Regions:
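Canonical Radical SAM [4Fe-4S] cluster-binding loop centered on the CxxxCxxC motif
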Residues: 37, 43-100
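Core AdoMet radical
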Residues: 84-132, 144-160, 174-202, 249-251
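Acidic (Asp/Glu)-rich catalytic clusters
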Residues: 106-113, 140-146, 166-174, 207-213, ...
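Distinct, well-ordered alpha-helical segments
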Residues: 130-138, 161-170, 229-230
Length: 383
């Protein structure tokens, strides 16, 4: 055993390996390949509108365009533990395909008529040349600028290079770049999320954006894998407080289980449970005064959009109160008012409080938590 190394909880002979290398590459699975090759590369994944707020706080309608692309550079090398965007990407997407998708999105929403904001998501970094052709990047930047729309795109922190950010700022001044920080903690980034960068990289990226007059939006992940509910509530609250001064907007994304990911695997083995909606309400209440100090300008804007809220694969409660609680959280993201949570109550709130109390006093392995929906007898069966 002298030559044994540790991989997770098991000692194996030979060279140490990454967690992802212990799991069959999901992008090579027959089902995954069939799905990816089945969609039309000239049509966007989805296009829709939502209520939003402009940078100055004015209510508006935002168009969201999610495109089918070649995916994210980090996924090609390793990938995050929780991200299933590789399910919607394919290697053979060309510039012509992306231009066709962009045209289809504009046609679907009548050239974004009535929308003051446009969000363009590419399952990776919008302005990374290896992911998306430069001519298509320029088309999106210049057209949205000419339309007078506020543009939001996404990027990885380590890809926010000085020269590229300067180019983006020239083509669309004042746009917003959303960075997937996920956690303001280097250990969580490395061991829970497998993000591939550290917090100082995020800080450097934010400084670069602000130096060129662009807005910085930071994504945080609520309840990364291998973390209990109580720890998630404490850590995310702390992270919001720590990054508020450097972020024009903070978007907290509660974990939702995406297919063929590491999180999907541990979820199916009942070693992970998505967060409670009550935890999100409590988190908002805990940080509201830090984000919106009384009598002072707001330090940032807090956005919480629970994807798949109310389902067993998304943030959920007992099932009877999910719709009402999730709607209140969504309304807060637009209004920024704690009055949205007035009158919310359910019997399951006591169960949530008990779980938080246990999490903060006793170790809970892998953040498994309690089943809120599963039949007790079924829970005894093998996964």
């Amino acid at each position: 055993m002298a030559d044994a190394v540790t991989a997770g909880l098991v000692s194996i002979p030979g060279k140490a390996v990454k967690l992802h290398h212990l799991v069959k590459a999901p992008e090579n699975a027959i089902e995954s390949i069939r799905i990816r090759e089945g969609w039309n590369a000239d049509e966007p994944a989805t296009v829709y509108t939502t209520p939003e707020r402009m940078p100055d706080g004015t209510p508006c309608t935002a168009a969201t365009v999610i495109l089918r692309t070649r995916g994210c550079q980090w996924w090609w090398k390793s990938g995050c533990t929780f991200c299933g965007y590789f399910n919607d990407v394919r290697d053979d997407v060309t510039s012509l395909n992306l231009h066709a998708q962009w045209l289809a999105a504009k046609n679907q929403l009548n050239n974004f008529e009535g929308c003051d904001m446009v969000k363009v998501y590419t399952s990776g970094t919008f302005f990374e040349d290896d992911e998306n052709p430069v001519d298509w990047q320029e088309t999106v930047l210049t057209e949205t600028a000419a339309m007078g729309k506020h543009l939001i795109v996404e990027a990885q922190a380590h890809l926010c290079h000085e020269d590229k950010i300067a180019w983006v700022a020239e083509k669309h001044p004042g746009c917003t770049v959303a960075i997937g920080l996920e956690a303001y903690d280097d250990e969580v980034l490395k061991f829970h999320c497998n993000k591939g960068f550290r917090t100082k990289t995020w800080k450097r990226a934010v400084d670069t954006l602000q130096r060129h007059g662009l807005r910085a939006k930071s994504y945080l992940l609520f309840k990364p894998p291998f973390m209990s509910e109580g720890d998630a509530l404490q850590h995310t609250t702390k992270w919001i407080q720590e990054i508020a001064a450097d972020s024009d907007e903070i978007s907290v994304n509660p974990m939702n289980i995406q297919k063929r990911t590491i999180v999907d695997r541990i979820f199916r083995h009942r070693e992970y449970r998505p967060p409670w909606l009550w935890s999100l309400v409590q988190m908002i209440r805990d940080v509201h005064a830090d984000i919106h100090p009384e009598g002072e300008p707001s330090r940032s804007r807090l956005i919480v959009h629970p994807t798949a809220a109310g389902s067993v694969r998304g943030a959920h409660n007992c099932g009877s109160c999910d719709k009402e609680v999730a709607a209140a959280i969504e309304r807060y993201s637009v209004s920024g008012s704690l009055l949205e949570f007035e009158g919310l109550s359910c019997d399951c709130e006591n169960q949530w409080k008990a779980e938080i109390a246990l999490d903060t006093s006793l170790p809970i392995p892998l953040g498994s938590g309690l089943d809120r929906r599963l039949d007790p007898v079924e829970a005894l069966l093998s996964p």
